[in-house]
Amino acid sequence: RMVLLKGHDERGFVFYTNFESRKAGDVLGNPNVALLFHWKSLRRQVRIEGPASRVTNAEGDAYFASRMRESQLGAWASDQSRPLDSRETFETRYQAMVERFEGKDVPRPPHWSGFRVVPERIEFWQDRAHRLHERRLFTRSGEGWSEGLLYP
């Protein structure tokens, strides 16, 4: 799945989504995930593996409040990934949310929040000639990290 990384700190990497989406269902069904950052033009990538868990309600609320109002309203109007009979139906639902929250702050919907991926393995890959790539792996070990190389 493609996601937008919205934060990272010593606790992990955070992205936000509709928890009724297929993507969220997949993560909730199997929280062992991988994030992949690929930069073709730089001939490098980073892969992060670890368990994903929901962010706190306070974190979800704070990030939702930072979004543009139109995006907040869209989160309320959308049944993400479900069949839609017409664009007009969605636009009508969106307009209903505009009216519902007119003059008020838009709260975070109960079905919308974020996941934090806690890294257990981080692999740095660099393209090399003749597929003799360089792969460096960091593995969480207690409170620290161990480092090693992998064959290409």
Residue ranges and their predicted role:
Residues 1-152:
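Binding-site signature for planar aromatic cofactors or substrates
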